[in-house]
Amino acid sequence: MTVGLNGFGVLLVMVVALALAQIAAIRERAVRDPLTGLYNRRYIDESLPGLLELDERALVGLALVAFDLDKFKGINDTWGHDVGDKVLRRFAQILADCARRTDLPCRMGGEEFVVFLVEQEIDGVAIFAERVRARTEEIADIAPIPAGRITTSAGIVLRHRGEGLEEMVKRADRLLYKAKENGRNRVESADSIEADPAQVESG
């Protein structure tokens, strides 16, 4: 059987297209958290420089919400890691449901999540964070966890001009620890009184 030049060209295009699709799939898996399907820290490191540049040029405003599931270690210790994984997947789904197409929810690791928002007003960020908090508190169908046991705390910040990713995350984390210190299951957005992470009970 012989293949003409036209047939060979079509075959070559198909092989190249398949190879490119496989490469794209491999890269996509590398930047996705395997448990929740959200983007991971690697994706943040690769993608955020572009957003930071747009923010510097005042084309967009950039905000960050840091979330942490309250007393999550107790969930794993009491009901096991399989149940804990269900909680993580459900929380990730809540983030995805509440996020807009321009927002970027990511899992940093463990029970820690962040969401980057194209937003210039703190009130808009607070509305998003409070919606996530309320939806999380309403989870009542992950047996055998009782209703109301699953909650999240959050810290929200707007990016300062010239601020890098690490600095932005640290500010959001300080507010997150403040939320934990003030009773958990709450959103903090003011830098006034910052909690020392070392003094806050785990979770």
State each model region's role.
Residues 126-129, 157-203:
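Catalytic-core segments of nucleotide cyclases and related cyclic-nucleotide turnover enzymes
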Residues 92-93, 124-142, 173:
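Alpha-helical scaffold within the catalytic cores of cyclic-nucleotide enzymes
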Residues 83-104, 112:
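Active-site-proximal alpha-helical element of nucleotidyl cyclase-like catalytic domains
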Residues 27-46, 58, 67-81, 89:
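Conserved nucleotide-binding and Mg2+-coordinating catalytic segments in signaling enzymes
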Residues 27-28, 41-61, 92-100, 118:
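Short regulatory alpha-helical coupling segments
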Residues 104-107, 148:
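A short pre-motif secondary-structure segment
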Residues 2-35, 42-53, 103-104:
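Signal-transducing coiled-coil linker helices
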Residues 97-102, 134-146, 176-178:
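Short catalytic/binding micro-motifs of nucleotide second-messenger systems
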